[in-house]
Structures are given as C-alpha cells and as structure tokens.
C-alpha cells in the first residue's frame, strides 16, 4: 500500500492506477445482522470466486469483529480490506462528537488491524427511510454547517493520529451533502489533509452532481471511489414521487453497469488520469435481494470495469 491507496503495479510499461474491489453492499447487505441478507461466509466465498481481492468491511458486526478471526477468514480466501465505514451527524452539534466516536473507534481499530487505510464516512439522512417522514430539516443553517465542518476536521485528525487512517467523506442521497454545491462547500471548508471525497458515482448522479466535473475540478480531493450507476428513467420517477432512498432502491433505481449513468468508461478514464493509485469499490445497492442474485452481477460488473481502463486492476 502507498500513502494514497493500493501499491501501484506494472502491466507492461504502465502503472495500474485504479484498483477495483467490492463490498457487502453489493451482496444486499445494509445491516450488521439481518436474516434477509447473505450470510457473511457466503459473501466472502462468492467475492473470492468472483475474482475480487479487495473488500470493505460493510456494517460493523456483519463480518467477524475479532481481528484474528477475520484475518484468518480473509487469508483463507486471498482477500484484503481497503476500508471501513462509519456514520456521523456532526451538523446536530452538542454531543455528536462523542456519539460518533465510540462506533468510529471500533471500526477504525478493525480496519487498521486488517491493513486498511481508509474510513468511508457517511452523513446522517434527514428523513426516515421507512416512513419517508422528515426527522429534521433538509437544509442546514450556518451554525449547522460550521458544526459539520468542524466535526469532520476533528474526526479526520483523530483517525490519522491514532490509527493512520484517511477520512473519505461519502456524499449521500437524502443527506445534507449530496448536491454538487453542497459537496463543493464541504471541500472549501474542510482541511484536505483531514478529509477528502469518497466519490460515489451513483449517489452523485442521484443527487444531480457530476462525477466527471468533480474529478476534473478537484483532482487532489478525490481520495476513494464507489462505482455504481443509476437508471435515469427510474430516477425521474423517484424525483416525481419524492421517494426516499430506500424506496428508490426497491424501485430499482440502481442499474447494473453499463446500463445506466454516469458513463463509467469516462469516469475511469478521468480517474486514471489522476496518475496516482486509488481504489474503486463496486457497490450495487439492492437490499433486500435473493441470495443467488448478487454474484453473477458482481462477476459481470468486474469484467466490464476491467475493460474500461488501460491501468485498472483487481490486485
């Protein structure tokens, strides 16, 4: 591993710049424990069988949390960890720093123990996924923005100092940071040494942001990628009916590549042009899903993405 991601490898005369991995999300996993989800052993088996090497931890508690146990399970399948995931609500101020830290510490400890170098940080959503009711305003006032920026700078500093991990902020549907102006404001008001983007191409498209524009205008702030696509016809329906993120997924808003938007060939070309190693983790949001559905999609997506770039690998 290097400071910014996977160690570059050589294929002929060119360095590999984008390393493709996958995540529990692509197997329909949103929660630590849910009988509707693929069992973790089957997930790991199918990831390896599908030809991937790198994975994310997914929701804390889905995979074994004992480092020795998890390390043995990964080694047996030739798998490695790129990142863990935490959730925050710093815009709410008050005790949110303390509230976020305990779960973040657990994820950071496990991620670092597995050799990962990144923590993907997802902001709280402003409406309930089940009922669709707003749990708070969908917009932030100036004080809330300030709390959000300060909280993430503090989190990034602790992750770096205590665990050697990099904070990759994940703009998210139904959160306060999803649209392009909000992403740009976040980048302007946070320390690039403490926070960069986990650019999720599907969430960006869903929220009306341009992945290509963000890569081209903020190349130094692209720290990590989630690769996915959106079905534009279903997205139009989602917007017309004001669906929640969960309802949109049930409606099929996520599209198996290459059938949706954005054009991942263009995204991968732009990312390879950054000329530094970076992870691109495949995410196919489809909770809940039958156990036999994810692996064929994961295999087809892997093969497609590897065809998109001249310096893209799974190793």
Q: Where do the protein language model's features map onto the residues?
A:
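A short, acidic, amphipathic alpha-helical segment used as a generic capping/interface helix at domain edges
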Residues: 258-273
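Active-site beta-loop-alpha junctions enriched in small/polar residues
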Residues: 23-27, 58-60, 86-91, 124-126, ...
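Residues at the N-termini of beta-strands
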Residues: 54, 118, 224, 278-279
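N-terminal pre-domain/capping segments
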Residues: 2-118, 142, 153, 196, ...
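Short, flexible, mixed-charge acidic loops at enzyme active sites
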Residues: 34-38, 125-134, 235-247
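Acidic/histidine-rich catalytic cores of soluble enzymes
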Residues: 22, 54-55, 150-257, 261, ...
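Active-site acidic/histidine proton-transfer and metal-coordination neighborhood
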Residues: 3-10, 96-197
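A short, acidic, flexible beta-alpha connecting loop/helix-capping segment that sits on the rim
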Residues: 281-296
């Amino acid at each position: 591993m290097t400071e910014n991601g996977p160690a570059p490898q050589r294929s002929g005369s060119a360095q590999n710049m984008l390393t493709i991995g996958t995540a529990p999300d692509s197997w329909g996993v949103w929660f630590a424990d849910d009988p509707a989800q693929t069992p973790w052993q089957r997930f790991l088996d199918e990831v390896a069988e599908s030809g991937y090497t790198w994975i994310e931890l997914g929701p804390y508690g889905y995979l074994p949390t004992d480092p020795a146990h998890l390390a043995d399970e990964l080694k047996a399948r030739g798998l490695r960890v790129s990142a863990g995931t935490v959730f925050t609500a710093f815009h709410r101020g008050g005790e949110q720093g303390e509230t976020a830290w305990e779960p973040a510490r657990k994820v950071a400890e496990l991620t670092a123990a597995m050799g990962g170098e990144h923590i993907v940080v997802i902001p709280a959503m402003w409406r309930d996924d089940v009922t669709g009711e707003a749990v708070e305003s969908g917009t932030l006032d100036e004080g809330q923005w300030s709390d959000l920026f300060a909280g993430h700078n503090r989190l990034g500093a602790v992750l770096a100092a205590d665990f050697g991990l990099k904070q990759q902020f994940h703009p998210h549907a139904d959160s306060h940071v999803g649209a392009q102006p909000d992403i740009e404001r976040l980048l302007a008001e946070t320390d690039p040494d403490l926070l960069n983007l986990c650019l999720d191409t599907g969430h960006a498209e869903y929220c009306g942001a341009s992945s290509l524009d963000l890569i081209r205008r903020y190349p130094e702030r692209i720290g990590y990628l989630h690769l996915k696509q959106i079905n534009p016809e279903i997205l139009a329906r989602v917007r017309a009916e004001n669906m929640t993120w969960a309802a949109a997924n049930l409606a099929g808003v996520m599209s198996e590549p290459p059938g949706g938007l954005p054009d991942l060939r263009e995204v991968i070309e732009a990312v390879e042009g950054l000329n530094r190693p970076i992870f691109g983790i495949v995410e196919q949001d489809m909770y809940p899903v039958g156990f036999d559905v994810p692996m064929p999609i994961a295999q087809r997506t892997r093969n497609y993405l590897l065809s998109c770039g001249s310096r893209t690998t799974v190793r």
